[in-house]
């Protein structure tokens, strides 16, 4: 045995001089890989939602055409089912993308539970943002909630679909959107040339695009909330934190609109 090999062996047995171990680079999709997979994941979410409506049309034995899809999809219970079915489709696509990289699903998405201090800080910041937009809306004489959402939620309440809508908008939608935006997109883009600030801004912009059913005013509000969620994702290294914040925001909006006012 050579002196160098003998020295290395002695170091490996010495607790004061542990052997040097190279840490493998994390297996992460970078900018373009994350972007392309992001499109695929969004498409999977869309297919899951549309597939749910097609299934309901088929069960009702209606012709599977645009008119039937619009008619069935306009019902509150059907829409709630559609939004809910987007979640498993999203999770499956994200799991596949991460699996190909042979990375840990939990580590890749930072599925770690935050501390109560982080949860409180995130909630207080979210409340301040929402209250600021609410105050601005009232000063401008604007509605605090888009009219079509108010009509949908109240219709769901009257048609006994309140709990389905509550689950869809307060659980399924926040999980789907956060796994895509602050989970998969943020993780890959923050490890690319965009770094953390660019990843927060770009993922927030794309999350805003998902809400194009709103007007520019409400889109600006969505974008500002997205920036806060992105910052909290970075600050806490916890996707569960942004999922909970997103769920609380939607839950409050749904309950206030559906039962306590317009």
Regions picked out by a protein language model, each given a short descriptive name:
Residues 28, 32, 116, 160-168, ...:
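Alpha-helical membrane-protein architecture signal
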Residues 57-80, 102-173, 191, 262:
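Juxtamembrane helix-loop-helix connectors linking adjacent transmembrane helices
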Residues 35-39, 80, 119-124, 163-167, ...:
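Hydrophobic alpha-helical transmembrane segments
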Residues 187-200:
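Solvent-exposed interhelical
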Residues 180-189, 252-253:
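Active-site-flanking alpha-helical
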Residues 48, 54, 197-212, 216-262:
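Functionally important transmembrane alpha-helices
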Residues 1-108, 251-262:
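N-terminal, membrane-interfacial amphipathic/helix-forming hydrophobic leader that caps
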Residues 86-89, 165-168, 221-229:
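Hydrophobic core segments of transmembrane alpha-helices in multi-pass, intramembrane catalytic enzymes
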């Amino acid at each position: 045995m050579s002196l160098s090999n003998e020295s290395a062996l002695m170091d490996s047995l010495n607790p004061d001089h542990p052997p040097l171990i190279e840490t493998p680079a994390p297996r992460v999709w970078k900018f373009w890989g994350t972007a392309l997979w992001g499109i695929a994941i969004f498409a999977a979410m869309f297919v899951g939602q549309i597939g749910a409506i097609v299934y309901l049309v088929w069960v009702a034995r209606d012709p599977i055409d645009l008119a039937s899809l619009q008619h069935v999809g306009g019902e509150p219970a059907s829409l709630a089912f559609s939004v809910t079915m987007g979640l498993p489709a999203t999770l499956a696509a994200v799991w596949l993308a991460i699996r190909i990289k042979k990375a840990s699903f939990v580590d890749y998405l930072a599925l770690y539970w935050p501390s109560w201090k982080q949860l409180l800080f995130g909630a207080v910041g979210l409340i301040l943002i929402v209250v600021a937009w609410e105050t601005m809306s009232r000063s401008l004489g604007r509605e605090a909630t888009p009219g079509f959402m108010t009509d949908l939620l109240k219709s769901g309440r009257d048609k006994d679909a309140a709990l389905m809508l509550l689950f869809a908008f307060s659980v399924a939608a926040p999980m789907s959107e956060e796994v895509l935006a602050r989970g998969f997109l943020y993780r890959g883009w923050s490890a690319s040339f965009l770094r953390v600030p660019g990843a927060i801004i770009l993922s927030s912009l794309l999350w805003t695009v998902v809400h194009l059913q709103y007007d520019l005013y409400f889109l600006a509000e969505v974008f500002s909330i997205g920036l806060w969620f992105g910052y909290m994702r970075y600050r806490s290294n916890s996707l569960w934190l942004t999922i909970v914040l997103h769920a609380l925001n939607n839950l409050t909006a749904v309950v206030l609109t559906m039962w306590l006012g317009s």
